[in-house]
């Protein structure tokens, strides 16, 4: 860990982390995202997703020290003056540590037989909760369609509770998605659907399509539905 304490808001690391927390464009350009909090950073370090650097509040709890002790020697860990770190943090109460990680370069899993498709979900909390539920349910991959919220926005990452480090999350155009889903039963999760979820056969290769909070699924997504 560097012993020099960062005090300037113009510091390169501080500016970059701030941009990653607030700008989707910066996340795309830098191919990176920020994860805040001891649990998330620890999950990231254990996952194999490449960490670029960590920022730690000068005054931080013992829980943060426990995370820092797991860092490889080659990983830059920089101390940030307390007020400056608090201004950078996206949470109301700073947890004292923030990690910048590369966006995972996921590939399509072999033998795809259980996927989740999210179409036009726009609430970050809902998206993050759905991602962690997908991981818990054993989904092999989550596909995001055009118009869905940025999966690596800070509120989504927090709500995902580490799913971002373990679950492949891919944003695909409609044409590619149709090819990938060929051969799978695509179920639309619809409150007014004729088939009960208890009657659906999810043991067959399938994908579950969930629409947005306000508008449901788009016409393009509806074209994918087989059941």
Go through each PLM region and give its residues.
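RNA substrate-binding interface of SAM-dependent RNA methyltransferases
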Residues: 46, 100-193
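Short glycine-rich anion-binding loops that position phosphate/pyrophosphate groups of nucleotides
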Residues: 38, 59-60, 84, 104, ...
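Active-site/ligand-binding-proximal alpha/beta "capping" segment
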Residues: 187-227
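Boundary-proximal intrinsically disordered activation/regulatory segments immediately upstream
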Residues: 1-64, 148-149
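Short, aromatic/basic amphipathic alpha-helical patches
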Residues: 62-74, 220-221
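Short acidic-hydrophobic, aromatic-tinged amphipathic segments that line or gate anion-handling sites
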Residues: 4-8, 76-81, 167-176
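Glycine/small-residue-rich loop that forms an oxyanion/phosphate-binding "nest" at active or ligand-binding sites
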Residues: 69-102
């Amino acid at each position: 860990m560097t012993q020099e304490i960062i005090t300037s808001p113009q510091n390169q690391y501080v500016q970059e982390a701030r941009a990653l927390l607030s700008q989707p464009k910066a996340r795309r350009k830098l191919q990176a995202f920020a994860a805040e909090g001891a649990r998330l950073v620890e999950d990231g370090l254990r996952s194999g997703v490449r960490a670029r650097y960590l920022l730690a509040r000068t005054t931080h709890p013992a829980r943060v020290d426990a995370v820092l002790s797991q860092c490889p020697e080659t990983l830059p860990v920089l101390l940030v003056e307390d007020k400056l770190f608090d201004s950078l943090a996206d949470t109301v109460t700073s947890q004292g540590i923030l990690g910048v990680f590369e966006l995972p370069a996921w590939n399509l899993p072999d033998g795809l037989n259980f996927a989740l498709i999210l179409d036009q979900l726009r609430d970050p909390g809902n998206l993050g909760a759905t991602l962690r539920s997908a991981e818990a349910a054993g989904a092999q991959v989550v596909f995001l369609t055009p118009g869905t919220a940025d999966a690596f926005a800070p509120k989504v990452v927090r709500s995902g509770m580490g799913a971002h480090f373990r679950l492949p999350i891919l944003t695909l155009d409609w044409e590619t998605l149709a090819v990938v889903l060929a051969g799978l039963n695509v179920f639309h999760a619809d409150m007014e659907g004729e088939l009960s979820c208890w009657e659906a056969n999810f043991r067959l290769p399938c994908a579950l399509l969930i629409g947005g909070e306000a508008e449901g699924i788009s016409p393009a997504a509806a074209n994918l539905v087989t059941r």
